[in-house]
C-alpha cells in the first residue's frame, strides 16, 4: 500500500535546476504526449527520472528495491513513487508535490508487488482502467525499462485494458534539445578534459604504464568535474585490439613509437564531457602526422556541415569521403551521436541515418581508423569533439588543440 505524503518544504533546498527548467521539461513532454495521444507516461529509468525531476540516488543499479517511478499524466501534476526512506531525496532535489511512498520496500512480497501499485496509480491518473500508456521502449536510442522482466509482466497484467505504447521517441524529442543550463554543464565537462590533457602533457614521464596514464587523468578530472568514470585508455602494446576499455590492467608499457587512445569521461551535473584523442608516444614521423591530420580534418568537415536540417547520415558520408580523399578509411559505421546525461543519445551519426539535426542539440563528432602495423601492434587514429547546434551552424565546445599530437619528448 502506498501512502501519499506532504512535503516538509514548499521548495527543494538542493534543486539541480530551477523551477522554470523543471516546468519547461514537463510541459514539453506533455506536448509530445498530446501529439501521440498518450494519457499517461510511466518512467522507471534513472536518467529519464533525473532529467524530468532532478531526482538522483546511487540505488538504481541494484534491483533489491525499486528506487523510483515517475508517472506523468496530461492534465495532472507528476507523481513520484519511492521507498519511504527516499522521501527526503524527492523533497531535497525535486519540485514534485505528489509523492507516494512504499513502506518496507526490501521485503520481497512488497518489492514484487510494486508493479501493481504503479498500475493502480496509473489508473487513478487516467481516471479509468482504459487508456494509452507510454513506456520506455521503442526504436530510437535503445531505451529500456531497468526492472526485472517479471515486474514488467506484472505491471502489464494489472493494466489488461490499457494500450501500451513505446514512447522513446516522445521522451527523446524532449531530451535531445538542450537548454542553456545543459549546454553549460556539457561545456564545463569538456573543459575538464582539456585541462586534464594539458596536465598530462606537462607531467608525463617515460616509465609510466597505460594504467598510470588512466589513473593520472582520472585524478585530475576529479579536481575539475563532479565525477568521472574510468577513462577509456588503450595502448598499441596490447596483444589484441581492445576498444573502449578502462586502464586497469597492470604491466602495459608505453614505449617510444607506440600509440595511445584516450577518452576521459567526466561528468558535471550528470552531463558527460569528452574530447577523445590519440597520441603518438614521442616525436611522430611525418607519415603518422599525415594520418592524424586527415582524421582531424574529418571531424572538421563534419562540424562545418552540421546545422539544422542536415541529416545525420550525410554527416557520416562527409566523414567517409574526407578520409577516402586522404587515402585512409573510417573503421566505424558511426561518426558521432547526441550527448547529455546519457553518454550516447540520439541521433546517431551513422551510415544511412535520415534523422535531421535540430537547433540546440549537442552532438559528439568523431572519426576513427584502426590498423595493425608490421609488428602486429594495433594502432588507433582519430578523436572526438562536441558541438552545440545553433540556428545556422554549430559552435565547438571546449576542445583540446589538435596540433598537440604527441605524448613524451
Kindly give the residue locations of the regions a language model identified.
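Active-site neighborhoods and metal-handling regions in enzymes and metal-associated proteins
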Residues: 1-409
Amino acid at each position: 500500500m502506498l501512502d501519499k505524503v506532504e512535503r516538509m518544504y514548499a521548495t527543494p533546498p538542493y534543486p539541480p535546476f530551477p523551477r522554470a527548467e523543471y516546468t519547461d521539461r514537463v510541459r514539453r513532454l506533455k506536448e509530445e504526449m498530446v501529439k501521440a495521444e498518450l494519457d499517461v507516461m510511466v518512467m522507471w529509468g534513472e536518467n529519464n527520472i533525473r532529467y524530468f525531476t532532478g531526482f538522483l540516488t546511487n540505488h538504481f543499479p541494484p534491483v533489491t528495491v525499486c528506487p523510483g517511478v515517475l508517472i506523468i499524466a496530461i492534465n495532472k501534476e507528476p507523481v513520484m513513487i519511492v521507498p519511504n526512506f527516499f522521501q527526503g531525496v524527492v523533497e531535497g532535489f525535486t519540485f514534485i508535490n505528489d509523492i507516494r511512498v512504499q513502506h518496507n520496500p526490501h521485503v520481497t512480497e512488497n518489492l514484487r508487488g510494486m508493479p501493481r501499485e504503479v498500475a493502480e496509480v496509473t489508473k487513478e491518473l487516467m481516471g479509468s482502467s482504459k487508456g494509452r500508456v507510454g513506456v520506455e521502449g521503442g526504436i530510437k536510442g535503445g531505451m529500456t525499462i531497468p526492472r526485472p522482466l517479471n515486474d514488467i509482466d506484472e505491471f502489464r497484467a494489472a493494466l489488461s485494458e490499457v494500450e501500451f505504447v513505446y514512447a522513446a521517441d516522445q521522451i527523446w524529442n524532449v531530451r535531445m534539445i538542450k537548454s542553456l543550463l545543459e549546454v553549460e554543464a556539457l561545456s564545463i565537462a569538456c573543459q575538464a578534459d582539456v585541462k586534464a590533457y594539458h596536465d598530462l602533457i606537462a607531467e608525463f614521464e617515460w616509465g609510466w604504464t597505460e594504467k598510470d596514464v588512466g589513473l593520472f587523468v582520472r585524478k585530475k578530472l576529479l579536481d575539475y568535474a563532479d565525477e568521472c568514470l574510468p577513462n577509456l585508455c588503450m595502448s598499441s602494446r596490447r596483444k589484441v585490439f581492445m576498444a573502449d576499455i578502462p586502464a586497469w590492467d597492470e604491466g602495459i608499457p608505453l614505449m617510444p613509437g607506440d600509440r595511445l587512445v584516450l577518452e576521459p569521461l567526466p561528468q558535471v551535473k550528470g552531463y558527460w564531457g569528452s574530447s577523445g584523442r590519440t597520441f603518438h608516444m614521442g616525436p611522430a614521423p611525418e607519415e603518422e602526422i599525415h594520418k592524424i591530420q586527415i582524421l582531424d580534418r574529418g571531424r572538421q568537415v563534419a562540424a562545418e556541415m552540421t546545422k539544422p536540417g542536415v541529416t545525420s547520415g550525410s554527416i557520416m558520408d562527409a566523414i567517409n569521403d574526407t578520409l577516402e580523399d586522404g587515402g585512409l578509411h573510417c573503421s566505424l559505421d558511426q561518426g558521432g551521436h547526441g550527448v547529455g546525461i546519457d553518454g550516447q543519445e540520439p541521433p546517431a551519426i551513422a551510415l544511412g541515418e535520415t534523422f535531421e539535426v535540430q537547433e540546440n542539440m549537442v552532438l559528439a563528432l568523431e572519426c576513427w581508423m584502426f590498423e595493425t602495423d608490421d609488428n602486429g601492434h594495433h594502432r588507433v587514429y582519430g578523436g572526438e569533439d562536441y558541438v552545440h547546434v545553433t540556428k545556422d551552424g554549430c559552435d565547438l565546445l571546449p576542445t583540446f588543440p589538435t596540433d598537440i599530437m604527441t605524448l613524451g619528448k
